[in-house]
């Protein structure tokens, strides 16, 4: 699509709002395309014109003395694109990742009631989404209050999967192609964990949560997982640990010996992620397992003593219907999962599934909206509450991802990560360490190399960067 920004500096907002309505489109500022948008400021007069194929709409707005120019230009563009497409994004002009955190800031500044009104009347968020942000904020606050000034969390990246799902944009690698990297990767990951633990102990930091993500951590063997757990136990002070999570993820990687290795290491929370309980959908997105395998893996985890199991579902997957999505939610609830995380499909450029097909069709957005609405009502009526939430760009319908849980089954790491409550020391390929200054709120990031082969080939540089953690805390 073509986007022209004339006589104003709000290009970031304009691009993000265009992406809300047309998530599959690449944005340029010249050439020809089926979609053209022009935003223009002339003194206190704002002008927006948009064309979709042979249909065009234009609107103007005269900026009043007490109005914020950036917000009003965004509202004008939102109104034009809503009328042009017939679609009103439920989060209005908001496109940030952390709506609950934003709500928290506004509630602190002006009070919760005024913040709610501001979300609805200024940002054009629906009352339902606004109230969701408020509810999540309240649950998050209880968890955030547990963190201390010197707290931190540990994230362990296992960027390998049995196969790569068609919707996935994460830096994860099929073990069919990278099996030979697994053992050297684990060897070096043990060394990075050892060094990171030494740094954390020397700084006198308090470890709150450990989270193994990926990828699919249970792509590793039971013995490889045990090696990592042993290194963590030997090099980190686990006496303050509140939560230990491993994403088992793909049910086709879940075995009894791996589950017992997790249990023996003190892992208390795992994820077994169906994404869907519709086998046709699973086949379409490249997940080589069946819904029965998910149910069997869940039963095996129960047999091994796990009483805090999360299940991930995705709304908006190809071949999924409202009826089959409802069945997926109902199945997760009937199994008794302690938490259910409902994601909205996000079409990232690195995913195999990205296509312009149906890019202008509102029906996909409305179907996904109905799916999310059903999950919200079903989970709430089944005794779950929303404890954390985040949003992604290019999600279908500009919807959200929400973690729902039963009483006291919140994932602390998810909340700490999304709120940026404290530092997160991250190890492994693609991992990003986030260091938080508790006095200023400033976040500094240290990036590990993205790909396993880079991580292996340039490991000395990874270890050298640990000095940046010491430098940060010395200041």
Predicted regions and their residues:
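Radical SAM enzyme core and accessory elements
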Residues: 1-112, 189, 407-475
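A C-terminal junction/extension of Radical SAM enzymes
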Residues: 33, 350-427
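Short beta-strand motif preference
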Residues: 48-50, 156, 272
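N-terminal [4Fe-4S]-dependent radical SAM core
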Residues: 84-88, 106-154, 203
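Canonical Radical SAM [4Fe-4S] cluster-binding loop centered on the CxxxCxxC motif
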Residues: 149-186
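Short glycine-/small-residue motifs
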Residues: 167, 337, 426-427
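Conserved non-cysteine loop/helix-boundary elements of the Radical SAM core domain that shape
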Residues: 172-374
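Short, glycine-/Ser/Thr-/acidic-enriched flexible segments
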Residues: 217, 394, 430-433
